[in-house]
Amino acid sequence: MNKATANERKKLRLLLVASRKHLSRGDLRSLIRFLESEDCGFEIKLQFSDPKEQPELLELHRLVAIPALIKLDPQPKQIFAGTSILEQLKNWLPRWEQEDILISSGLGINLRQKESENGRTRNELLLEDENLVLRQENETLSNQIESQERLLRMVAHELRTPLSAAKLALQSQALGQIDLIKLQEVVKRRLEEIESLSKDLLEVGTTRWEALFNPQEANLANIAAEVILELEKFWLSRGIGINTDIPADLPNVFADQSRMKQVLLNLIENALKFSNDGDTVEITMLHRTNQWVQISVSDKGPGIPEEEQQRIFLDRVRLPQTSNETSGFGIGLSVCRRIVEVHGGKIWVVSQPGEGSCFYFTVPVWDKRNKSLEPLTLTQG
């Protein structure tokens, strides 16, 4: 696309419908930078709107998902949504520029009356464009429905942990192992967790669950200690040891504390579940590079065949050799993968059948210079 000079640039009025949390995403920040750059080729007037403050926009523009970028002027209106808004926009900019040149030269009027070189009328071309937009909207809607279904499965999985812990506390109190005050503390904390999950469900109708996370400065050692304490009854009752190797100078990370707790809780709970009585579970954290902290959780359980090591991170995958003995990995590891990826990290497993498994994941280091609590744009080697 030829870059126009400032005087030659035509105006393009766009509306970005997105919440404040959406605007912290790397893809939207890249979109905004592109629209503000010389590479765009148009004189852009970009407006922002938060759907929570102006919910009527969802109905007015018939939006099926947010964030969404809307071309308001020149007509016809066009909507881009999903996680590839910038790529979609770049594909359309040359076409809009060409249309503008044709109309400005007077050829645009003839195009409306005559057939184009390939035999299609202007109206047919416009209809084709509208069909493309509808296909994009349909794809976005399908992705939104899939995201909502994943969130429902995730919440159902997460509800089991606080409910099981509350049930265990009731049993412990009945056996005289804890007093009533301790029971009340446990039940209160678990009810708060369930309430938090309910809030996520209330938001799922208007946004993707990935946008629900609230990254901030977090101390992974403290989060791990909290998880280990919560699972104390499970590992003490079976004589399983938990060893931690966490440096005193481990830097804080940039992460959603509740989501990080989900990941650690799931990985440690799995390690305990697949360990034999008397085994040891190892939890290690290290400052791998200037930008990343690496966490690992290892056990001496049955291990995972190599051909299964990628599949276990997919939705609702259970290992054949453990399905009859345990509840399997279920949805938990797919949830871990999505949470880690939302933070920009990676998750993987190293395992040999009969020799145990070690799960690794990475989290970005907190940058003290970042005062706006926005995610860093990081790359891993």
Swiss-Prot record:
Its EC number is 2.7.13.3. One of its GO terms (biological process) is circadian rhythm. GO terms for cellular component: plasma membrane. It catalyses: ATP + protein L-histidine = ADP + protein N-phospho-L-histidine. InterPro entries: HATPase_C_sf (IPR036890), His_kinase_dom (IPR005467), HisK_dim/P_dom (IPR003661), HisK_dim/P_sf (IPR036097), KaiB_domain (IPR011649), Kinase_SasA (IPR023527), Sig_transdc_His_kin-like_C (IPR004358), Thioredoxin-like_sf (IPR036249). The keyword ATP-binding applies. Residues 154-367 form the Histidine kinase domain. One of its GO terms (molecular function) is histidine phosphotransfer kinase activity. SMART domains: HATPase_c, KaiB. The modification Phosphohistidine is found at residue 157. Keywords: ATP-binding, Biological rhythms, Kinase, Nucleotide-binding, Phosphoprotein, Transferase, Two-component regulatory system. The keyword Nucleotide-binding applies. The N-terminus interacts with KaiC, while the C-terminal histidine kinase domain autophosphorylates and is probably responsible for self-oligomerization. The N-terminal domain stimulates the C-terminus to autophosphorylate. Member of the two-component regulatory system SasA/RpaA involved in genome-wide circadian gene expression. One of several clock output pathways. Participates in the Kai clock protein complex, the main circadian regulator in cyanobacteria, via its interaction with KaiC. KaiC enhances the autophosphorylation activity of SasA, which then transfers its phosphate group to RpaA to activate it. In addition to its output function, recruits fold-shifted KaiB (KaiB(fs)) to KaiC to cooperatively form the KaiB(6):KaiC(6) complex (independent of SasA kinase activity). Homooligomerizes. Interacts with KaiC. Participates in the KaiBC complex, whose core is composed of a KaiC homohexamer and 6 KaiB. NCBIfam families: PRK09303.1. PANTHER family: OSMOSENSING HISTIDINE PROTEIN KINASE SLN1, TWO-COMPONENT HISTIDINE PROTEIN KINASE. This is Adaptive-response sensory kinase SasA. The gene is sasA.
